[in-house]
Regions:
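Conserved class I S-adenosyl-L-methionine
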Residues: 37-47
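A short glycine-rich, Lys/Arg-flanked "PGG" loop and its adjoining helix->strand segment in the class I
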Residues: 56-57, 128-142
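Conserved Class I S-adenosyl-L-methionine
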Residues: 158-176
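A short acidic, Gly/Pro-enriched loop at the edge of an enzyme's catalytic core
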Residues: 102-114
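Conserved beta-strand signature within the Rossmann-like core of class I S-adenosyl-L-methionine
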Residues: 143-151
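S-adenosyl-L-methionine
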Residues: 77-104
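Class I SAM-dependent methyltransferase Rossmann-like catalytic core
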Residues: 2-32, 36
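Glycine-rich SAM-binding Motif I of class I
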Residues: 49-53
Length: 177
């Protein structure tokens, strides 16, 4: 079976995750970013772990996925959402990490690091994106992939819509990174 389809066809997934699949297309995202069995992956601001959990299913027992939560998100969720997820849906290769967006505290030597639907949050939360991006590149292996997926704002808007409608202009992110 296709490893990307297999990642979302696993029975032990929350119904809320399964309901997001048609719009979020995690199998296509993980394929696009070339996540493979045995990879070491990090996700910045992983929220409740939707993409991290799917990535953990692809990397398998030989791989590791580090799902980052910031102190702000832990306060907002009244606890670490990744730890809460793991209590109900255990994945032995999914590890919660805590740190600021600028320095997520990933171990060195990751193959891929994702920022999924949260790059715009780094803008409105006033995170130092230069430090964040440099931290990512310092953590990746040579040739590693920094995958950013976010809602695209209309051309010319830059960062103007990051807080109100949670959009950021694609060309702005490409230039900045």
């Amino acid at each position: 079976m296709d490893p990307y389809k297999k990642a979302i066809d696993i029975v032990n997934r929350p119904d809320t995750d399964v309901s997001r699949d048609p719009n979020r297309k995690p199998d296509e995202v993980l394929r696009f970013f070339q996540v493979h069995e045995g990879d070491k992956v990090g996700e910045i601001n992983a929220g409740r772990g939707y993409f991290s959990a799917c990535a953990a299913n692809v990397v398998g027992e030989k791989g590791k996925v580090y799902a980052h939560s910031s102190p702000v998100s832990i306060e907002r969720w009244k606890g670490n959402p990744i730890e809460k997820r793991l209590k109900e849906f255990h994945q032995s290769n999914l590890y919660p990490v805590v740190g600021e967006m600028e320095e997520p505290n990933f171990p060195d030597g990751l193959d891929k690091i994702f920022n999924i639907m949260t790059y715009h949050d780094a803008v409105w939360s006033k995170a130092d994106r230069e430090i964040m991006n440099q931290s990512v590149f310092n953590t990746l292996v040579s040739g590693g992939i920094y995958g950013i997926l976010d809602h695209n704002a209309k051309d010319g808007s830059g960062i103007d819509n990051c807080h109100d409608i949670h959009r950021i202009e694609k060309s702005f992110v490409i230039e900045e990174v």
